[in-house]
Amino acid sequence: MRPSGRNNDQLRTLKVTHNFTKHAEGSVLIEFGDTKVLCTASVVAGVPRFKKDSGEGWLTAEYGMLPRSTHTRMDREAARGKQSGRTQEIQRLIGRALRASVDLTKIGENTIKVDCDVIQADGGTRTASITGASLAIRDAIDYMKQNGMLDEQTSPLMSQVAAISVGIFNNEPVLDLDYDEDSNAETDMNVVMNSNGGMIEIQGTAEGKDFSEEEFAKMLGLAKKGIKEIFESIF
């Protein structure tokens, strides 16, 4: 039995609020159960030096957690003077996943800067960030079209992206782990896919106990089922 009472193949309740903030070109509050992440996509003129004069755009992502998004307060990373390795790893993952969905040759020399800020954490913050950010990017691209920054016929979005966590909890494969499950899981895996059914990234780690190829296949099957439901529900 899962602590939440959910079936092993059951997602948490999903909720998306578009235009959650008024300044960003795209903004989405995404909620997976008690995990809540604010995802914004800002369009900035210009590109990094390595992209200058290429005619192409760029997309980058940042990730952070509010001090009391967790059970006990943590200091802001800005106050500590550096980002943790975990934060750097997560924002690289978010950036990679999102760049796989956007044709950067079609947005001109503009940069889409994605910010994912965890308001409340209850497991799956990185996968929620990827999913919410993909929606925010779609809204930002619509803004660019409506404001003459892109031709109405231009479609930089090659696909949408969604992600979900799976794992082995109490010796059983489960979908969409919350904090209680994630902190006690024998295996934790994150899967990122696009709306065309393609795989973008799989991260899987055994926590003190290995997992079999059969268990991997079951977890992957759960992830594919969950991501399909996410696309049908909120995209």
Swiss-Prot record:
Catalytic activity field: tRNA(n+1) + phosphate = tRNA(n) + a ribonucleoside 5'-diphosphate
EC number(s) reported in the record: 2.7.7.56
The organism's place on the tree of life at top rank: Bacteria
Family assignment from sequence similarity: Belongs to the RNase PH family.
MF terms in GO: 3'-5'-RNA exonuclease activity; tRNA binding; tRNA nucleotidyltransferase activity
Keyword Chaperone: no
Enzyme class at the top of the EC tree: transferase
Organism: Francisella philomiragia subsp. philomiragia (strain ATCC 25017 / CCUG 19701 / FSC 153 / O#319-036)
An annotated GO BP: tRNA processing
Gene: rph
UniProt xrefs under HAMAP family: RNase_PH
Quaternary structure and partners: Homohexameric ring arranged as a trimer of dimers.
One Pfam family cited in the UniProt record for this chain: RNase_PH_C
UniProt name for this protein: Ribonuclease PH
Function: Phosphorolytic 3'-5' exoribonuclease that plays an important role in tRNA 3'-end maturation. Removes nucleotide residues following the 3'-CCA terminus of tRNAs; can also add nucleotides to the ends of RNA molecules by using nucleoside diphosphates as substrates, but this may not be physiologically important. Probably plays a role in initiation of 16S rRNA degradation (leading to ribosome degradation) during starvation.
Residues at which phosphate binds: R86, G124, T125, R126
InterPro entries for the chain: ExoRNase_PH_dom1, ExoRNase_PH_dom2, ExoRNase_PH_dom2_sf, PNPase/RNase_PH_dom_sf, Ribosomal_Su5_D2-typ_SF, RNase_PH, RNase_PH_bac-type, RNase_PH_CS
Keywords per UniProt: Nucleotidyltransferase, RNA-binding, rRNA processing, Transferase, tRNA processing, tRNA-binding
